[in-house]
Amino acid sequence: MTERITTPNADRTVQHHALPVDTTGLIFFAVFASSFVLYRRGSCFESYLFFSFPLSYFSNNRKKSRVQSDKQFFSVFKKNDPEQQHLYYAALMQFLTQLVESPTLFCVCTQ
């Protein structure tokens, strides 16, 4: 949204963002910190629910896809394969970074 402001000295155009930068940074930090705390506690189940519940809740075949994704997810963590765990969290952090860097995507996801 753009707003034109006229002052005695000059005309200038001010562009308003959907969210202030401070708020976006705070949201990113809160999500990152909570996922890191859950990961360090070893509570993979809680961190999995934290990130997957909003996505899986609205899917059409929720039960079927949820059971399948649970099996795939827990097979990675039951094997205690650090490489797979690292790939999972790296992909998650990349997604969150892109989400914060793109204000349009961020606004669509939060509506």
Curated annotation (Swiss-Prot):
Membrane topology: Single-pass membrane protein
The entry's keywords: Membrane, Transmembrane, Transmembrane helix
Superkingdom as given in the UniProt entry: Eukaryota
Chief localisation class: membrane
Segments passing through the bilayer: 20-39
Subcellular location: Membrane
GO CC term, one of those recorded: membrane
Other notes: Partially overlaps YPR169W-A and YPR170W-B.
Protein name per Swiss-Prot or TrEMBL: Putative uncharacterized membrane protein YPR170C
Species this protein is from: Saccharomyces cerevisiae (strain ATCC 204508 / S288c)
